[in-house]
């Protein structure tokens, strides 16, 4: 089984100049990792997005980063393309809505996270 992982390191062209300085491809036999590195002027590299793919080429997950920490709405999908999860992060911690779905498209769990902890009412669907 080969998994495709594409990690993109991007910088806002409005604030910083973008220059691809290196591209790599790694294979461990189980998956392939594609890496693109962007220079943030003289201050190093910044990762802003990570994409993973199922062996059939369907996107498995899409994760966003800000200042090196997971941030924003992150999603995952099943091999058939149906949604599997939507998690909200803020500065590296779970913060906001947290929803998971069964592979048949029905919700399995729904709740809210605050600073990495469950907050309020959580609903489990059977």
Protein language model features and the residues they cover:
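Periodic aromatic/glycine/histidine/acidic cluster detector
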Residues: 18-126
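Sec-dependent N-terminal signal peptides
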Residues: 2-13
């Amino acid at each position: 089984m080969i998994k495709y992982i594409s990690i993109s390191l991007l910088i806002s062209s409005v604030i910083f100049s973008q220059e691809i300085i290196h591209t790599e491809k790694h294979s461990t036999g189980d998956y392939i990792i594609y890496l693109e590195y962007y220079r943030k002027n003289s201050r190093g590299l910044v990762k802003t997005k990570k994409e993973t793919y199922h062996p059939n080429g369907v996107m498995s997950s899409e994760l966003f980063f800000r200042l090196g920490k997971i941030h924003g709405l992150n999603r995952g999908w099943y091999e058939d393309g149906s949604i599997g999860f939507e998690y909200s992060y803020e500065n590296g911690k779970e913060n906001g809505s947290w929803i998971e779905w069964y592979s048949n498209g029905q919700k399995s769990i729904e709740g809210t996270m605050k600073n990495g902890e469950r907050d309020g009412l959580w609903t489990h669907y059977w």
